[in-house]
Regions:
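Bacterial N-terminal signal peptides that target proteins for export
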Residues: 1-7
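Bacterial N-terminal signal peptides
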Residues: 7-17
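Predominantly soluble domains enriched in secretory-pathway, periplasmic, or organellar proteins
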Residues: 22-409
Length: 409
């Protein structure tokens, strides 16, 4: 009898409290593209392929008033803030540079150059989840690890790369670089992280005779389990050995082949790109692309020393997409022959990335406030979408299916 009463009591408790429920399933995600509007401090979200329809947009500086108060109360920070405005910002504050979504698609992590930080923005509320202030006074390019759990950010003025937990913003490690760390690229499934330092790009000492003033420009390769440097590469000696002493060794956008055997990169002041064999540690080819007759050869007119800034590769490794920034075009290049296709007119294209379906290259046209998609197969423009003020970085990301942008704040 006692056993029956206990069983009845247990059943009654289960009815009253409810049966244990399985954990809620994670929301289904859709792939999108994020476009960072550097001067506006906003992000536009567009479809990652097809017609590239705009899905919405939101601010990545909801805390701007607080940040500006902190800056204006600190004379040193204020001096750097105004220096960024008059230098790389071309008279504007640089409010968003790079961005990636968290693996669950609920937040966007963005670097904010003028505010010298990295923040996580909740994609439902538009509010900050966390903020990490970088060392020094400017945040720049980022990279996300292949598993999506870590994000690396270049701290320009402190010659440091910080590696953060993408969910919490906690620093997992950091390492020293050359002068003005810029591009970051994970390789070997995330085992290594490559950082390219570009040196001083904000002075007018751009003539070859003044190259020595540009500082220490090198690649720093670290092991991501220890963040210790395993290799440094100064392309100066490699370029000289190839017979191109005239080219800068400041590496700008860079992309590896799918098998990691070749690295393609742009350098300061040059209308073209370089091919580097990773295993043999040699420059193997240099491609010079056409100059726009309307573009001045005065190096001081190139934005932050970049004549061309933007490089992507088709998923099969067969084609390269080049953003010819100061020459106002983009073009698809056959990687085997290095023959360029049609020169697609573009207004100061500043970045290139691959569409979600791998068929197109998407460039940001920073002077026209739009992004354009160019077919890898035909080399022709297939779509253009209006975005915000001065688009730069374009990145693939994910949001929940049915996502709508948070209210503007």
């Amino acid at each position: 009898m006692a056993r029956k009463l206990l069983a009845f009591a247990a059943l009654a408790a289960l009815v009253l409290t409810g049966a244990p429920q399985p954990a809620a399933a994670a929301p289904a995600l859709q792939e999108v593209m994020f476009v960072g509007n550097n001067w506006a401090g906003t992000v536009d979200v567009i479809r990652s392929s097809g017609g590239y329809a705009r899905l919405g947009g939101f601010s990545v500086v909801p805390d701007l008033d607080t940040r500006l108060l902190d800056i204006y109360l600190n004379p040193i920070r204020l001096a750097y803030f105004l220096g960024i405005r008059s230098g790389p910002g071309e008279g504007h504050d640089q409010l968003v540079d790079d961005m990636y979504t968290t693996p669950d698609g609920t937040a966007l992590v963005a670097s904010r150059p003028s505010l010298a930080d990295v923040v996580s923005i909740d994609l439902r509320t538009g509010l900050l989840r966390w903020r990490f202030g970088v060392s020094g006074y400017r945040a720049d390019h980022m990279a996300v690890s292949p598993d999506g759990t870590q994000v690396a950010v270049s701290a320009s003025t402190s010659n440091t790369v910080h590696v953060l937990d993408i969910a919490t913003g906690r620093q997992l490690g950091s390492f020293a670089t050359g002068d003005k760390p810029h591009e970051n690229v994970y390789t070997d499934g995330g085992r290594y992280l490559w950082n390219m330092s570009i040196g001083e790009v904000n002075t007018d000492l751009d003539a070859p005779a003044w190259d020595w003033t540009k500082g220490d420009r090198r690649i720093t390769v670290v092991d991501t389990t220890t963040f210790r440097t395993v290799r440094t590469i100064d392309m100066r000696a490699r370029l000289d050995a190839y017979g191109r002493r005239d080219l800068s060794n400041a590496i700008r956008p860079a992309v590896f082949t799918p098998d990691g055997s070749r690295l393609y990169f742009q350098v300061s002041f040059f209308n073209g790109f370089v091919e580097y064999d990773v295993a043999t540690d040699r420059i193997t080819r240099v491609k010079t692309l056409p100059e726009n007759p309307a573009t001045s050869d005065d190096r001081t007119t190139f934005v932050n020393d970049s004549r061309h800034h933007g490089l992507a590769m088709s998923p099969d490794g067969g084609k390269l997409c080049v953003a010819g920034t100061m020459d106002d075009y983009a073009t698809i290049v056959d990687r085997a022959t290095l023959q360029e296709g049609p020169l697609v007119p573009a207004s100061k294209p500043y970045w290139a990335t691959v569409s979600g379906d791998g068929r197109d290259c998407v460039i940001s046209e920073s002077a026209a406030d739009q992004v354009s998609a160019i077919s890898f197969a035909t080399g022709r423009r297939v779509a253009t979408v209006a975005v915000g003020d001065h688009p730069q970085r374009v990145r693939i990301g994910h949001v929940p299916v049915g996502w709508t942008a948070p209210a503007t704040r």
